[in-house]
Amino acid sequence: MERTVFLNGDFMPEGEAKVPIFDRGLLFADSVYEGFGILDSQIVDYEYHMNRLDRSLGELDMPWPMSRDDLLVAMMTLIEANKAVEGFLYLQVTRGSRDRSYLYDDDYQPTVFAFT
């Protein structure tokens, strides 16, 4: 059975999730990630991890891909969809996709994906 994953606001079977080859996360590792423990279908130390994600995004001058509240709803929906009682949730945010260039501006639309 395929897992449900989250990509840019949508939930889908893992086999349908596609990230463009020109995404800066792939080309330049221009991304941040955070790992969340899951226990009793709840996120362990949620605030700690979200604060660390905030710090990491800030260090790379990357915007949040969505509000913290919306991200929490997405993560909890993902946990429920995959019936994850104990485990791990991986979340990654990239600067986004555009033609390959070392330079970037504030116009990028971040890519966000997560899976359990």
Question: What is each of the regions a protein language model found here?
Answer:
Residues 1-116:
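Conserved alpha/beta cores of soluble small-molecule-handling proteins
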